């Protein structure tokens, strides 16, 4: 039997495929390489370059590779792109996810793990936010994640498909052994930007919003190490294979860090003072979003290994430094 990983050549995907291979799993990666890289797919995993919405290809892979589970990570991570072209985003993500789920049902695939996002909560009324909180997706990216969760729930009710949706916080860090890391061109996430500035690849670090109702006036997020996020997907797969029911769980540490806290930590680790420039708030930016981890810790026995912010940033900085040397 094999595991099909969509988006397995990307940031989280490549880390997950490494973890699956370390567990001895047969892995098929389906990726169009729009934000992924062939070199990021580890030895022993099969890379198929193709589209997650290609029904004929999906049918072929699921039958010939004897796929028993799908880990669905495909999807662009740059949220501003989803805002710039929402209809195109829905076509490339929501509609194609429907094709993936339909192919799984048609070919007898019993388990799907969805990489969802805490972004679907929007502006939560409480932090840490539990899974029972109302959903308020504010961007096409978040709408896509919420709709994918809904499609899986309905497929479960109608066809018996079992699934786990992992609402993950802001993924950061890199493989602790330095095998893979964040390599997406044009990425806009805070950690990537701050580390590039620390390595002299950016002139300054913009801070969008310094007047929020938080201790230092900047936004707060739950940063999750990419290796811990990969482990959560493995735990979700093990849960389903053991006959567990469908679940929706947060994947986070229950502790948030502000923008300025991240910048200060990078300055300490890198030993540099960065040029930090205040900017106006961006539309629909969330003030504070921290995931309540109680359900995932209880139901999936997930045991995060790298929850310390400085550890996350040290691994990420080591990766970025090596990437800069390779590019020189």
Q: What are the functions of these language-model segments?
A:
Residues 13-14, 79, 97, 148, ...:
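Alpha-helical structural signal
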Residues 1-174:
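N-terminal Rossmann-like NAD(P)+-binding domain of SDR-like oxidoreductases, especially those catalyzing
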Residues 90, 138-146, 180-192, 222-223:
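Short-chain dehydrogenase/reductase
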Residues 191, 199-328:
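C-terminal substrate-binding subdomain of Rossmann-fold SDR/epimerase-dehydratase oxidoreductases
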Residues 176-179, 218-219:
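Short acidic, glycine/proline-rich loop/turn micro-motifs
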Residues 50, 183-187, 255, 305:
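Residue-level signature of the cytosolic catalytic core of signaling kinases
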């Amino acid at each position: 039997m094999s595991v099909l990983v969509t988006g397995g050549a990307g940031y989280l995907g490549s880390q997950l495929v490494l973890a699956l291979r370390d567990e001895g799993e047969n892995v098929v990666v389906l990726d169009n390489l729009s934000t992924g890289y062939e070199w990021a797919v580890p030895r022993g995993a099969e890379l198929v370059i193709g589209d997650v919405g290609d029904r004929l290809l999906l049918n072929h892979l699921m039958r010939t590779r004897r796929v028993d589970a799908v880990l669905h990570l495909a999807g662009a991570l740059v949220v501003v792109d989803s805002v710039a072209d929402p209809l195109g985003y829905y076509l490339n993500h929501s509609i194609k996810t429907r094709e993936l789920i339909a192919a799984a049902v048609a070919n007898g695939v019993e388990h799907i793990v969805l990489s969802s996002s805490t972004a679907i909560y929007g502006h939560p009324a409480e932090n840490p936010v539990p899974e029972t909180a109302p959903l308020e997706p504010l961007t096409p990216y978040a709408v896509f994640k919420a709709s994918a969760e809904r499609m899986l729930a309905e497929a479960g009710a109608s066809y018996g498909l079992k699934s786990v949706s992992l609402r993950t916080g802001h993924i950061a860090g890199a493989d602790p052994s330095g095998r893979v890391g964040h390599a997406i061109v044009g990425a806009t996430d805070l950690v990537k930007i701050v580390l590039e500035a620390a390595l002299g690849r950016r002139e300054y670090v913009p801070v969008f919003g310094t007047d929020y109702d938080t201790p230092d006036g900047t936004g707060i997020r739950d940063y999750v190490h990419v290796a811990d996020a990969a482990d959560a997907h493995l735990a979700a797969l093990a849960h389903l294979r053991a006959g567990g029911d469908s679940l929706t769980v947060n994947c986070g540490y229950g502790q948030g860090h502000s923008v300025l806290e991240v910048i200060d930590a990078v300055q300490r680790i890198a030993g540099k003072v960065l040029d930090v420039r205040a900017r106006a708030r961006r539309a629909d930016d969330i003030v504070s979003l921290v995931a309540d981890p109680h359900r995932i810790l209880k139901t999936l026995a997930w045991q995060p290994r790298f929850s310390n912010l400085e550890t996350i940033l040290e691994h990420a900085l080591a990766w970025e430094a090596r990437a800069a040397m390779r590019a020189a």
